[in-house]
Amino acid sequence: LSNYYIIIRRFYSNLYGREGYLTWTLPASPHAIILSKFVGALVASLYCLFLLFLSGFITILVMGAVIGQDLSPVFSIIAEAFSHSIAYWIIVWWIFTTASGIFLFYVSIALGQLFQNRRGLKAILFFFLLCIVLSIIGTAVNPLKDSYAVGSALVYGNIDEFGPNFIPGLIYEVIKIVSMYFTIHYISKYKLNLQ
């Protein structure tokens, strides 16, 4: 949660807050400014995700040492999971959904800037409205929506064949990312009104 708070706060204050006057007078295009904020946020989010998995790994090691049991079967299960292509599809899925989530925060803040007063409140309202609408649309292309197919893939061992089910979801995420990016760019370039 603190990572998201930092991402939101830095984007808002650097582009639409008091620092916005300085940011928009830099000799850089709006594309460069928005992409620099996005890349920084994406790297920070993926780093936090990596640290989460690393801490889980260390916790398993410490648990094994404390209880005095060999936890090598746990590591063999993890290694076996990464031998399937589905693990790589899930990693790519996480990267795209993380990027989409960051742009969702950014586009909500940008849409809130279209109003003269109570911009923060309107940004929060846009966030919840966009979450509802995008979630309804996203259920149609969610790769894990068919629980029978997931269960069958796990039971019968053909989990590698399940990977291509991620393609419609990834296309949807790319469409969301591109549309939100250009919405942010348009608002920042043509409708920017710093107060």
Regions inferred by a protein language model and the residue ranges of each:
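Hydrophobic alpha-helical transmembrane segments of membrane proteins
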Residues: 1-19, 30-195
